[in-house]
Each structure stands twice: as C-alpha cells, then as structure tokens.
Curated annotation (Swiss-Prot):
Function field: 3-hydroxy-3-methylglutaryl-coenzyme A reductase; part of the first module of ergosterol biosynthesis pathway that includes the early steps of the pathway, conserved across all eukaryotes, and which results in the formation of mevalonate from acetyl-coenzyme A (acetyl-CoA). HMG1 catalyzes the reduction of hydroxymethylglutaryl-CoA (HMG-CoA) to mevalonate. The first module starts with the action of the cytosolic acetyl-CoA acetyltransferase ERG10B that catalyzes the formation of acetoacetyl-CoA.
Primary gene name: HMG1
Protein family: Belongs to the HMG-CoA reductase family.
Compartments, record wording: Endoplasmic reticulum membrane
Membrane topology: Multi-pass membrane protein
Biological or metabolic pathway of the protein: Metabolic intermediate biosynthesis; (R)-mevalonate biosynthesis; (R)-mevalonate from acetyl-CoA: step 3/3
Lineage: Eukaryota, Fungi, Dikarya, Ascomycota, Pezizomycotina
Entries under PANTHER family matching the protein: 3-HYDROXY-3-METHYLGLUTARYL-COENZYME A REDUCTASE
One GO MF term attached to the UniProt entry: hydroxymethylglutaryl-CoA reductase (NADPH) activity
Species of the source: Gibberella zeae (strain ATCC MYA-4620 / CBS 123657 / FGSC 9075 / NRRL 31084 / PH-1)
Principal location: endoplasmic reticulum
PROSITE patterns: HMG_COA_REDUCTASE_1, HMG_COA_REDUCTASE_2, HMG_COA_REDUCTASE_3, HMG_COA_REDUCTASE_4, SSD
The protein, known as: 3-hydroxy-3-methylglutaryl-coenzyme A reductase 1
Compositional bias of kind Polar residues: 1137-1149
Length: 1181
C-alpha cells in the first residue's frame, strides 16, 4: 500500500496486472488532462509557438529586471562592506582551550568585548608562479601601507588547487577597525618590473589593480571563460573534499540521466528530436518556475542552482515524458492495426475513422494520465514540505523553486510536449507515405500509381477532399499563419509596452558569480582554514603567548590583475569615446520621447544582450530545422509489427484448427462468436442469386440517338471532349484508328469505361471476330475493380480481371506466431492437404525458420574487342578498388538497393557480371536494373573501360525465370530453411503414417527419384504447388515460381520423432511494388501482417513473407508425402475433384465424405466388402 505513494521510477517494474476500475480521482482528473491535451493536439504548432514565446518573454523579464538592469551599478564593489559579506569569524581563548571556534556575525559584539578583533586579508596575484608568466607578484614590503596602520604580514597558505592556478598570495592581519583604510590604500599596487609604455591615453605602466574595482564592460569569450575558470577554482578552494566528490558524482549522474533519456527515446523511434524537446520542455518549466520564485521574493543563487539542479534532475528524471511517449506511440500502432482490420471487416469502423493523433494521445492519457499526475502531486508535496521545513542553507529556497518547476513541467507535459508528440505522429505518417511512394518508384511504378498506393496506407485513406495536417484540413493553414503572426505581434507589443513600467528593484538583490553570470543573494562563505590556515596558526601562537583572547574575521581573498589603469577603469579612447558618446546620445535621444522612447530604448538594450541575441539565432535555427524535419523525415518506428502481441494460446489454436480442419467444418458448441460489424460499402451487391450479375458485363443499351458524323467526332476529339461521346462513338473512332487502343484510359480518364470500350473493339475486330465476338458479353468481369492501380503498373490493354478462388490453410505456428496462409488455386485438395500439414506441425510445437541469404541478382553481359581487355575488366571488378567504385555508383541510384557482391564469369570476349543486392521490401528487379545501368555507365566512362559494349542489361546470368544450377547453388532472392519436429504419435494419428515409412519415401522419391531424373533444385514433392498458390494470392510474380520453387526436402527419424526440413535458396518475393499494390493482393499481405515496407528495418516484411512461404512449403511437403505413404492421394483427388474412384464391384462403394478423406480414413463407416485386400490393408495403416 505504501508503495503507491512512491513515484513509479522508485517502485520498480511490476508484473502487469489486470485492468482495475478507475478511482474517484482518476475519473475526475483524467478528463481534464484529456481536454487540455486535445486542445494542444488540435493546434500543435500554435501551442509550441505560444509556449516558446512565453518562455522567451520570461527570460527577457529576468534580464530586464535582474541580470542586465540599467540601474545596477556599472562598477564592481571594492568597498569594505561588500568584502565582509562572505567572511567568517573565529574566536580563540582560554574558554575554547585555545582552539579556533566559529561564531555567527550577529554575536560578534558580545564575543569580542574582551578580545582583540583582527581582520585577516589575503591578496591573490594570479599566474605569477607560472613559468610562462612575464609578471611577478609584488613583495610584501612593496605593498603601499599607510604608516598609521598596524599591519602584520603572515605566512601564506597553500592548498591542493594552488598548483593549478599558479597564484601568489600575500596575507596580512590588522585591527578590524583599520580594515577599510587598508583596503582603500591597496586598490592599486605598483608592479616592480613594469615598464612605462605609450598608450592611447599617454605613457603609463601596468599596475596590480583589484578586480572588484573593474568597470563591468562586455567581455570577450576568452575573458568570460577565464573569469569562469577562476571563479570555479575559487569555489573548489573553499569547498570540502567530500562536497566536491558528491557534486562531481551528482553531475555525472545528471549527464547519465540525459544519456538515458536519449537512449529511451531512441528505442521509441526518435534518435534526437524527442529527447531535445523533452529537455526544452524542462528548461521552459525551469524558466517559468524561476521567474515566479523571484517575483515572490525568494532569493535564489546561481551557486545554489549549480548544487541543487543535478540532484533534482537525477531524482525526478524524465520518466513521465518517456512513459507518455511510449503509451502514445503504442496506441498509434494499435490504431493503424484497427484501420487495417476495418478494411478487411474485422474492426470497428467508428474507431478506425477517428484521427490517429487524437486517438493515440487520448488513449495514452486515459491509460497513464492519472498515474503521471499522481507522481507529480507526490513530488510537489514532498518539495513543498521541504520549502516549509525552515531548514537554512538554501534548502528552503531550492525546494520552493523545484516545486514551482515541477508544477510548470506538469502543465507543459500535457500541453507543449503532447503538441510535440502530435508533430512526431504527423511526421511518422508523412514518412510512411513518402517511403512507400519512393520505394514503389524505385521499383519502376509510375509516380501517380505510387502516390495512390501510398495514400491507401494507414489513415491516409480516411481523408476526403482536402489533404489534412495534424488531423485538420490544409485549408486552415492560411488562417493559422495569420493568427500566428497576429499573436506573435500581440505578445511582443505587450512585452514592449511593459518595459518602461518594470521596476528593476522588484526582484531580490543580485550578486554576480562571474562578471557575466547573474546570481542572487550573498556569495558562499569562505573556508577560513583553506584560505589562511598558516596565518591563523601564527595569530593563535601570538594570542597564546600574550594570553589574550582573539577574534579574527577571515575575509574573502582579494584578487588582483595586472593591467593598464585606462583599460581597467574603461577610459574611452578617441575612437571608442566617440562611439560611446554617440551611443549615449542615441539612447538619450530616445529617452526624450517619453514612454515611446523608453520602449525603443528598452528594445535596443535587450538586443544588446549577448545571451538574448544567441537565443534568437538558436530559435531561428530550430525553426529551420523543424521545417526540414517535417519535409525530410528519417527512418523511425516504434516496434516490429511481426512480433506477436502475446504467446501462442494452445486452446485458441486448437479451436482455430478445428474450424479449418477437414474433419469438422463447425465450431464446438458454445464457441460461436458473433460477426463483427462491417463498414457498409456503397453499391455492394446482395448475397443472392443475382450476385454474379455484378461480375458480368451488362447488356449494352442501344443508343437512342445515332452516331454523330465522323467530322464532328474528330472535332470533339481534337478539343479533348471525348467524355461527351457515347460508347458506340468511341468504339467507332477507335476502330478507325483515331484513338489508339492502349491510350483509352489516358484519353477517357474513366478506367472502367475504357476497359468496356476495349472489350467491344476486340469483340468486333473483323480479323478475329469469329473467335472474340463473345468477349463483349463474356463472363470475364471488369466492373467494381480499382483499375487506377493497374494502369501504368501491372498490365496493359486490360479487358478484365481473372477471379481465382482463395483459401486459407492453417493456422500454422511459424517462429512463435500463428498465421493463416492464403492460397489462390484451382487445384482441389491442395489447401486441405496443407492444412493437415499445418495441424501436424503445430502439434510438434510449430515451424522454425532460418534466413540464410537475402540478395536479388541481375546479370548483365558486356563485350570487349579482345580477350585481354575482357580479362582486365574481370580482374578490376574482382578487385577491392573496382568493387568499391561499382558499389558507390550502384548505391547512389536508390535509398533501398545496396550492392552486396559481384560475381564474374568470362566466356570468350563476353564478360558476365552477376550483381547481388538487397532491395528493401520490394522484389526489386526494376530497382536493380536501374542500378546496374548506372554502375556500368560509371565503369565505362570513369573507370577506363570506354571500349566496353553493353550487350544486355540482363544476360541470363541472373538467372531470372529460368531453371538454373546457379540459382540452386549461389541463391537468388531470399534463402530460407524451415524445420519442424513431429512426434511419432502425431504422425500416426494425424498423418496416418509412421516415421520410418515417411523417411524411406522421402529418400526414394525426393532424393533418388529426382537425381535419376537429373533434376536441378527439384528434390521435393510439390513445393511449386504451394509457392505458386501463395504467389498468386499475395501478388508475387508467377513466372518466378520456376526458380522460387527450388527446394530440397529432408526427413530424419529423430529419437522416434519425424524431423523434416525444406531448404529453399532462391525464393523471390516482395511486399512492395508489382502485383502487391493491387487491393485483393494487399489484403492477403495484410492477413499475414507484411504489407508494404517495414516501418523500421526495410526488408523485414519481405523476409518475413519468405519465412512464411518456406514454412507453408514444409506443411505441404509433409502432408503430401504422408498421403503418398498411406496411399490416400488418388482417392482424395477423386473425391474432391471427380466422381468416386472405380472399384471392382458392379455397385460403387459409397463416396467418402470430403471431410474424412484426409484425416479419418480408418474410421470410414462405409462397407469394405467391395474393396480389394490391398486397399483394406492400406486403410488399416
């Protein structure tokens, strides 16, 4: 119970629990967070710009009112009171056993009534011990001291950091009352080795001058860095060793937290920007918290921030941003799956129509919002208790600031950061679209078709009319631009108008840590024993000898620098003086115009700030980067869609198998699942007897009006008014050669009508009309088909489409995930046989696949005049230099094609080069051809082979669409090996055979039989059957079944179980381009979860499809070999496809039911009296 009060990052990972009912607070707070985030997600750019402007305004306010106020003194304080602020007071006497004891400043008067009060001053002369230094520190005797002061030189004190700073130190003690006079006298100390030189202010010498007396001018970067380093060393000198170690570890932990943030965001799909935006959100929250804290009068110092911020970052971290990001990205993936399911009728259309950004963010906040808010509340309460604790030393102030920072971080998480996530999701959507379109174009698909296919992916299909951005119509972009500009002007006008009325003293008093860094409140007190331990020992010895209690005020070390007085005190030169006078006059001129003049003066003063000017440059750079980021999105993703969401449920798998089992076509009682609602499609024919009418060409209506004259028709054609013509007029023009048959789609713009016209033209063509006259009214369907994807991509001179029955085999467990295997075939028993093999494989734990190769090939042929030149070209291509040049040339043609290797062969003066490349998720023949052409061009023009003649881009050395030993040996496309281990009892019960019989059959048939036939790659039972069926169903190239079906099936008896494997070295598949862009084939790829390009690793989808095909071939091989071993093959085919098998009896035996043909042969109820003895014996096996 107590662990609930801890933030999530401290509770550790817990086992996922079942969903619980939301609490009362969750029900009321979560909708508020959802409403706020909904506004931010609806207008993400507006939200980001508004927050950035407010943060900039807060920064400018801090500058104007605190750090760069014009009313602050321009000369550093070199007076006694400023020096005493960081001092420490010590007392030694008989009551302290003559040991130094620290006392508070407010008790000095009481403690020093009976004691000598001394001041201990240390003068620091930097870099005077360095070997490279040309200056030397003044000796103690050369320090100008008034004669009326009682000054006692003391031994200086060295510490561990003195060696790094190379400083010289002089220490003095004197009565405390004489301190101000001594300080005034030592503001300048002459340098003993200084030489008088001529400067723009006359002749002068360099002098040791107190740095505190220097005028605050704009320093260079080198000066700023030098001052910062000096102040850093001062802090180290005054800090305890343990404190230094703790701070060092704190800063290391803080930077490790930053690294952890970027690594976590990288896992979520963002290499850089989400991590940077998370840091920006935290910085903006810190600025808001800082300005509120200072407005409320709470003093905050830079030293306090430098000590506390690392531990705040480590303690709070960025876990909430990471949790929200993970939830949003996961729900975005879930939404895309719902869209795909809704297309196939599996999902809810209402949910799929919801904007993906709104859905993802709202669902994530509903799931994680209350948990995040609770963590914020707990952390803020803890910090509030720290602020109210009364603990001194800066803890109160820092806790107050941290609480406000967390409050604003909470606000920005649900506004600014959710807007950033909306932009990220929109960019992911654009990226998927662009990647798919470019991959299709690389594969040879026209840009128009590629654009249409890419838009069909994901939530692009839901956009009607205008294109959308962030779920809003693009027509709102001009309105957004106007509102953004007006809002920006309004905010800046408010900021400008408030400048004259701001009170520079409204914040706490400010002290500087370094001359260019702003701080608040008093500096850190010195450590007296690190600064002057030797001097304190000398004073203590003198006090003990005099038996006189002593009070010592150890003051902050006084730093000097060797400089010309004119530069130190910023005396203007002739040129600089003019510029200064001009600047003063310029500002004074504006001051004379009252409030308006003070506005302009305030603006100019703000722009002079180096930090603000750099921020403006950074903001502009980020704006440019964001625009580039929107239009040049990189490869990102969240998680692999091929990874199963849950482990295999054996009960669910058994029910699925029983539904698709040949032995039972119904679900068990009590397992009926009502159909999910399906989206109503327009013009969907009813499932009635007239359903086939939609697949037939309706009888052409006779035109009421006769055809217009040919001259009028030709005039309409010239005026591009073809759409106004009737079908008969178009047929007439086409048959007279006025409209080419191949150009009907382009001319008409109506693809279905163009197909209809072409059918009429072919049917009436006199040369073939005796054969083709029936085409016009044939049963070849052509309507209700998306011809836009076909035109320019898949087929020409289209007259219709050929429906093929598609069945599913399975489910089949492949590498731990279940699949239903789509198979388009007209061969009966094939799907049922594969399903039986799937059932047996599942009983053995599923199939395991290994991808052995991935590389499509293209083998051009080039020729040379002489064998010598051909041999030189071969040697060059085989060399490392030649390979590098060809790879660079080839890879430059595509974002996805990457040349792996080249294999060369010489035949006379002909040189054959086999390019082997990866092609992403496309099968890639067109992609490779383009790369090969360019690589050969570079070889000819830039590599010194200008006498090379390109005979053919494809020289049959690929080898494509032909049986070849090269593909069998060297591989082509994907190389896959699939394996399954089937227990012996499963072989007997499901496959109706035994292990030894199957092993013997495989050796005799698949190995010896194929070898006797001289087969190349055909050491299998019927791999081509499965490959061809899946190829047709998923839009692969059917001609490549020739080499894709290369397969060797191996069976072994493994301790009583059947070990079966198939090795397929040349499986040529793709999930992008070609026939995969057609909607039915895309739907089957969706069924397998591999449609299109993989979101994170191009090529993973096509590799997954190859694994699925390999495992499916394994199932087909197992089932067919079992049927052959059991003698069921002919009987099953006869019962599925033809009449019953003939018998010797005059009365035929009853037909075995289809559902029993493959699985329940031994339990047939028909009489066996009419069967032969051999048949009866086989049936008992």
């Amino acid at each position: 119970m107590a662990s609930i009060l801890l933030p999530k990052r401290f509770r550790g990972e817990t086992a996922p629990a079942e969903k619980t009912t939301p609490s009362w607070a969750s029900k009321r707070l979560t909708p508020i967070a959802q409403f706020i985030s909904r506004l931010a997600c609806s207008h993400p750019i507006h939200t980001v710009v508004l927050v950035a402007v407010l943060a900039s305004t807060s920064y400018v306010g801090l500058l104007q009112e605190s750090f760069f106020s014009t009313d602050l003194p321009t000369v550093g304080k070199a007076d006694w009171s400023s020096l005493v602020e960081g001092s420490r007071v010590l007392r030694a006497g008989p009551e302290t056993a003559w040991n130094w004891k620290a006392i508070e400043q407010d008790s000095i008067q009481h403690a020093g009534a009976d004691a000598d009060h001394l001041a201990l001053l240390t003068l620091v002369f930097p870099d005077t011990h360095s070997a490279e230094s040309s200056s030397t520190a003044p000796r103690s005797s050369h320090v100008p001291v008034p004669q009326n002061l009682s000054i006692t030189p003391l031994p200086s004190t060295k510490n561990s950091f003195t060696a790094y700073s190379q400083d010289s130190i002089l220490a003095y003690s004197l009565p405390y009352a004489e301190g101000p006079e001594f300080l005034a006298a030592t503001q300048e100390i002459p340098s003993e080795d200084a030489v008088e030189t001529e400067t723009q202010h006359g002749r002068e010498k360099k002098t040791w001058i107190m740095k505190a007396a220097k005028v605050n001018t704009q320093n260079s970067v080198v000066q700023w860095a030098n001052n910062a380093w000096t102040e850093f060393l001062d802090l180290l000198k005054n800090a305890e060793t343990l404190d230094i170690v703790i701070m060092f570890l704190g800063y290391i932990a803080m930077h490790l937290t930053f690294v952890s943030l970027f690594l976590s965001m990288r896992k979520l799909g963002s290499k850089f920007w989400l991590g940077i935006c998370t840091l920006f959100s935290s910085v903006f929250a810190f600025l808001f918290g800082l300005i509120v804290t200072t407005k409320l009068g709470v003093p905050i110092s830079v030293i306090l921030l430098s000590e506390g911020l690392p531990f705040l970052v480590v303690t709070i971290g960025f876990e909430k941003n990471i949790v929200l990001t993970r939830a949003v990205m996961s729900h975005a993936i879930e939404h895309r799956r719902q869209i795909q399911n809704s297309k196939s009728g599996k999902g809810s259309p209402e949910r799929s129509m919801q904007n993906v950004i709104q859905y993802a963010v709202q669902s994530a906040i509903k799931e994680k919002g209350f948990e995040i808010m609770r963590d914020y509340a707990i952390e803020i309460v803890i910090l509030a208790l720290g602020a109210a604790s009364g603990v001194q030393g800066g803890l109160q102030h820092f806790c107050f600031l941290a609480a406000w920072t967390l409050f604003f971080d909470f606000i920005l998480l649900f506004t600014f950061y959710t807007a950033i996530l909306s932009i990220k999701l929109e960019i992911n959507r654009i990226k998927r679209h662009v990647d798919m379109r470019m991959a299709l174009e690389d594969d040879g698909v026209s840009r128009r078709v590629a654009e249409n296919v890419a838009k069909s992916d994901g939530d692009w299909t839901r956009v009607k009319g205008d294109s959308s951005l962030f779920g809003r119509k693009s027509s709102s972009v001009p309105t957004f631009k106007v509102l953004m500009i007006l809002g920006f002007i309004f905010v800046n006008i408010v900021n400008i108008c408030s400048i004259p009325f701001r009170n520079p003293r409204s914040l706490s008093t400010i002290r500087t840590w370094a001359s260019s860094l702003g701080g608040v409140v008093a500096p850190l007190s010195v450590d007296p024993f690190k600064v002057a331990s030797n001097g304190l020992d000398a004073i203590l010895a003198a006090a003990k000898s005099n038996n006189r209690p002593t009070l010592v005020t150890v003051l902050t070390p006084i730093k000097y620098e060797l400089e010309y007085p004119s530069i130190h005190y910023a005396l203007g030169s002739a040129i600089n003086g003019n510029n200064a006078e001009y600047t003063d006059a310029f500002h004074h001129h504006f001051q004379g115009y009252g409030v308006g003049g003070r506005m302009v003066g305030g603006i100019l003063k703000s722009l002079e700030d180096p930090v603000l000017s750099k921020w403006i440059v950074i903001a502009l750079a980020l704006s440019v980067a964001l625009n580039g980021y929107l239009f040049n999105v990189a490869r990102w993703g969240i998680k692999d869609p091929n990874v199963p969401e849950h482990n295999i449920d054996r009960n669910e798998l058994a029910r699925a198998q029983q539904f698709n089992d040949t032995g039972s076509a119904t679900l068990p009682l009590g397992e009926y699942v009502p159909p999910t609602p399906m989206r109503t499609e327009p013009s969907t024919p009813a499932i009635t007897d007239d359903e086939a009418e939609g697949l037939q060409m309706t009888k052409a209506r006779s035109d009421k009006l006769p055809n217009r004259p040919n001259e009028e028709l030709e005039k309409l054609l010239a005026e591009k008014r073809v759409k106004e013509m009737s079908d008969e007029e178009l047929v007439s023009l086409s048959m007279r050669g006025k409209i080419p048959g191949y150009a009907l789609e382009k001319t008409l713009g109506d693809f279905t009508r163009a197909v209809k016209i072409r059918r009429s033209i072919i049917a009436r063509n006199r040369a073939t009309s005796d054969l083709t006259h029936s085409l016009e009214r044939s049963k070849l369907p052509f309507e209700k088909y998306n011809w836009e994807r076909v035109f320019g991509a898949c087929c020409e001179n289209v007259i219709g489409y050929m429906p093929l029955p598609v069945g599913v085999a399975g489910p089949l467990v492949i590498d731990g995930q279940s699949y239903f295997i789509p198979m388009a075939t007209t061969e009966g028993v094939l799907v049922a046989s594969a399903s039986r093999g799937c059932k047996a494989i599942n009983a053995g734990g599923g199939a395991v696949t290994v991808l052995t190769a991935d590389g499509m090939t293209r083998g051009p042929c080039v020729a040379f005049e002489t064998l010598e030149r051909a041999g030189a070209a071969k040697l060059w291509l085989d060399s490392e230099a030649g390979s590098d040049i060809m790879k660079k040339a080839f890879n430059s043609t595509s974002r996805f094609a990457r040349l792996q290797s080249m294999k060369t062969a010489l035949a006379g003066t002909n040189l054959y080069i086999r390019f082997k490349t990866t092609t992403g998720d496309a099968m890639g023949m067109n992609m490779i051809s383009k790369g090969v052409e360019h690589a050969l061009s570079v070889m000819s023009n830039e590599a010194g082979f200008d006498d090379m003649q390109i005979v053919s881009v494809s020289g049959n050395y690929c080898t494509d669409k032909k049986a070849a030993a090269l593909n069998w040996i060297d591989g082509r496309g994907k190389g896959v090996v699939a394996e399954a281990i089937i227990p012996g009892d499963v072989v007997r019960s499901v496959l109706k055979s035994d292990v030894d019989a199957l092993v013997e059959l495989n050796i005799s048939k698949n190995l010896i039989g194929s070898a006797m036939a001289g087969s190349v790659g055909g050491f299998n039972a019927h791999a081509a059957n499965i490959v061809a069926a899946i190829f047709l169903a998923t839009g692969q190239d059917p001609a490549q079944v020739v080499e894709s079906a290369n397969c060797i099936t191996i069976m072994k008896n493994l301790r009583g179980a059947l070990q079966i494997s198939v090795s397929m070295p040349s499986l040529e598949v793709g999930t992008l381009g070609g026939g995969t862009i057609l909607e039915p084939q895309s739907a089957m790829l969706d069924l397998l979860g591999v449609r299109g390009s993989h979101p994170t690793n191009p090529g993973d989808n096509s590799r997954r499809l190859a694994r699925i095909i390999g495992a499916s071939v394994l199932a087909g091989e197992l089932s067919l070999c079992s049927a052959l071993a059991a003698g069921h093959l002919v009987r099953a085919h006869m019962q599925h496809n033809r009449s019953a098998a003939p018998s010797r009896s005059t009365t035929p035996a009853p037909m075995t039911p289809v559902s029993f043909a493959m699985t329940n042969g031994p339990e047939r109820s028909a009489s066996t009296t009419s069967m032969s003895a051999a048949a009866i014996q086989r049936s008992k096996r």
